[in-house]
Regions:
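Helix-centered, glycine/charged polyanion-binding patches within enzymatic domains
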Residues: 176-246
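Polybasic low-complexity intrinsically disordered regions
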Residues: 24-50, 57, 70-193, 199-200, ...
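Basic, amphipathic alpha-helical segments enriched in Lys/Arg and hydrophobic/aromatic residues
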Residues: 44-47, 222-280
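Soluble, non-transmembrane catalytic domains of enzymes that act on hydrophobic metabolites at membranes
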Residues: 14, 145, 208-211
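Basic, low-complexity segments
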Residues: 1-29
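Short arginine-rich
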Residues: 66-68, 273
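Short, compositionally biased low-complexity segments
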Residues: 51-58, 211-217
Length: 280
């Protein structure tokens, strides 16, 4: 059992002065007092639902045992984390002919409990998270954060484009929410195999989109098409959402939209690191 095991790499302490010198070289205005690697560590700890003020206290306690470690205050932590650039797929290795599975899931914007919703009839809605997952490595190649009223099909192009920057795609697996002529046509134009489940009452008429017509002909009356084409690998994206929610919870702490997006990107980035560790 390794869940909850804390592995803390303190290499950034040894290179504290060297990293700060490089960061402040040519900088105008106030100087940085904390290296970026240290801020990334704080961001990771914060992603595990440890608020910034408690994080300040945690680092003050840790600094008593680690020589050279300086504990920043609450304001500094918040300011630096809010401006930190997060590359979700930084730990992803480039590959060819990659198959991705895409889907979306809702994340609560508060953790005050369902009882409050029922008693006071208060509805704050959800944040919708769209992701594209490599079915081989289970790593997230692309992520988009939207309001709850944004349809899944509209986000496919952005997920595919985001994934293409990290890997050469060969196939996209998606459920019926992504069934549209525009999506089939887009994937075909990119040279990507569209493995999208079409609606049961879909017409056999192509309507100007032959890739979708071929999918309708293939799926209609063929109960084995899922197994033959590997549609079952779509569960990889559902597995990714399940892991994210079990590790980080089903809600977010941030309130402002830019910070909400940053928090979710950070959690996805940490998830990818976990998946890379499992692969190794």
């Amino acid at each position: 059992m390794k869940r909850g095991l804390i592995l803390l790499d303190l290499d950034f302490v040894a290179g504290w002065s060297r990293e700060l010198k490089a960061m402040n070289e040519g900088k105008e205005g106030g100087r940085y007092r904390y290296p970026e690697s240290f801020i990334k560590l704080l961001a990771v700890v914060h992603a595990y639902v440890l608020p910034y003020r408690q994080l300040e206290g945690f680092m003050r306690g840790l600094s008593q045992y680690v020589d050279g470690l300086k504990a920043p205050d609450y304001t500094t932590i918040w300011w630096r984390v809010a401006r930190m650039k997060v590359d979700v797929a930084s730990s992803v290795e480039m590959d060819k002919d990659v198959t991705i599975a895409v889907d979306s899931s809702g994340i609560k914007v508060t953790n005050r409990g369902e009882w409050i919703h029922k008693k006071w009839r208060v509805q704050r809605g959800f944040i919708k998270v769209h992701i594209a997952v490599d079915t081989k490595t289970k790593q997230i190649l692309a992520i988009e954060v939207t309001r709850e009223d944004v349809g899944d099909g509209r986000m496919l192009r952005r997920l595919v484009n985001g994934s293409q920057s990290k890997a050469a795609l060969g196939r996209v697996i998606a459920d019926g929410a992504y069934d549209s002529k525009s999506n089939f046509r887009m994937l075909a134009d990119m040279g990507i195999d569209p493995l999208i489940r079409v609606r049961k009452n879909a017409s056999l008429k192509g309507g100007g989109c032959m890739p979708r017509k071929f999918a309708v002909v293939e799926q209609r009356g063929n109960l084995e098409w899922r197994r033959e084409r590997g549609y079952g690998y779509r569960w990889m994206v559902e597995s990714a959402f399940s892991c994210l929610k079990r590790v980080f919870g089903e809600y977010i702490c941030a309130v402002k939209w830019p910070n909400i997006v940053k928090e979710l990107l950070l959690k996805a980035s940490i998830y990818n690191l976990f998946m890379k560790m499992n692969l190794n």
